[in-house]
C-alpha cells in the first residue's frame, strides 16, 4: 500500500478553485432500481430521466440530486449485444456496478484545464 504524499506535488493553480462535486456517473445493471435506492434511503430526489420515453433506444439514465445539489446519474444499457453499448457492457461484466466518472464544480474550468494540459494531461474534451 502506498503512502499519501506528505507535501503537495507541484505548484497550486492560481485560478480555478475547487468548489465541490457536481455529479458522479454510475454504470449499473438497473438504473431505475439504483436511483430508487438513493431516493428511499439517503434523501435524494429524482431530478431527470432519459430512456425509451424520451427517445433513447440504447441506454436508460436516471438522475437523482441531494439537498447540496450533488447529482448521481445511473445508466444501464437496454441490450447486452448492441455495438453502441460495447464499452458499457464490457465494463459491467468486468467490474459490476460502479462509478464511471466524477465531475467537479470549479471556479474557473478553463484555467484548470489549461494548467492540466501544460502539465502533460491528455484532453478528452475542451471546456
Regions picked out by a protein language model, each given a short descriptive name:
Residues 1-32, 97-106:
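N-terminal beta-strand motif that seeds the catalytic metal site of vicinal oxygen chelate
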Residues 2-9, 31-34, 111-114, 122, ...:
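Amphipathic repeat-derived elements
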Residues 2-9, 62-85:
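Conserved oxyanion/phosphate-binding beta-strand-loop segments in alpha/beta enzyme cores
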Residues 8-11, 46-48, 86-88:
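Short secondary-structure boundary micro-motifs
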Residues 16-71, 118, 126-127:
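Core segments of cupin and vicinal oxygen chelate
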Residues 38, 89-127:
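Hydrophobic or amphipathic alpha-helical targeting/insertion segments
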Residues 51-53, 81-91:
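Membrane-interface interhelical loops and short amphipathic "cap" helices
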